[in-house]
């Protein structure tokens, strides 16, 4: 079994590679990654010497490079994690998101059509559904919820999802799609809420919180997400969408305060900044379908997952301190310096 994992040097992709090589030692895993700002080759250091692992630096939009890789490897399965994923960056430069998230997906599916695969899996997001009102805690996103995007990022992911389903209907490509809630855990790039707050706390820097911090997110530990995708690519029904939720809804401000408490830092570090444009209020996923069909449920409670995550950042300062130097500092000042 050969699996191409695109975006495998990023947060979720790298965790998925670790999971698959550990669980299926006979599988061959090929990572294709462009190594943008969010891709870090050092993340893959634990598997670089594994004889069943190969890393290829390439852009999923590079048709020649993608087709060459398929010619060499003849993969059985393709799992596409490769994406521009940060909402704030999509507001600053939407074009990059459209190119990578939609056109890159099209390139991968064209390669799958030419070389033949048993499964193409698209890793997507609950953000394609838009948001839910704070005063309706009884409402959840299901796979039947209409697409109603709020940002250039979510629009690009929705466009890719629709393209994947169209390739299934038009060309009978064997596809599946998963839409997950917010992930957290090891190797998370420190522009996202949880790793940003941990890093800033450890450096006694201000903790920028959008608006009043009342936005609610459903949090999914990355290892649980990887196990769900593992199930889908092996047992999921072709042509189907599966929602993957963590059953861990929390307000942003409560998460930030919890991180302060765990690290023994004062809440006075919290700084409220101008809210994000079009900021979604609440995400909440109903994972009934994946539970009933594939037997998956999240295993990690948020209280346990956040402790493990914080400890990982304490134990791996060199990894994230290297990341937040250079270009990231320029981006950070641009996003939060004058808000």
Please provide the spans of the model-predicted regions:
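C-terminal substrate-binding subdomain of Rossmann-fold SDR/epimerase-dehydratase oxidoreductases
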Residues: 3, 29, 58, 195, ...
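Residues that form or flank phosphate/diphosphate-binding pockets in enzymes
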Residues: 12, 38-39, 64, 188, ...
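Short histidine/acidic/glycine/proline-rich micro-motifs that form metal-
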Residues: 35, 182-185, 215-216, 276-277
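A glycine/serine/threonine-rich, flexible loop-to-helix segment
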Residues: 47, 135-136, 190-198, 274
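Residue-level recognition of oxygen-bearing side chains
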Residues: 65, 96, 103, 146, ...
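The catalytic Tyr-centered alpha-helix of NAD(P)H-dependent dehydrogenases
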Residues: 137, 149-156, 186, 190, ...
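Hydrophobic alpha-helix immediately C-terminal to the catalytic Tyr-X-X-X-Lys motif of short-chain
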Residues: 159, 163, 167, 197, ...
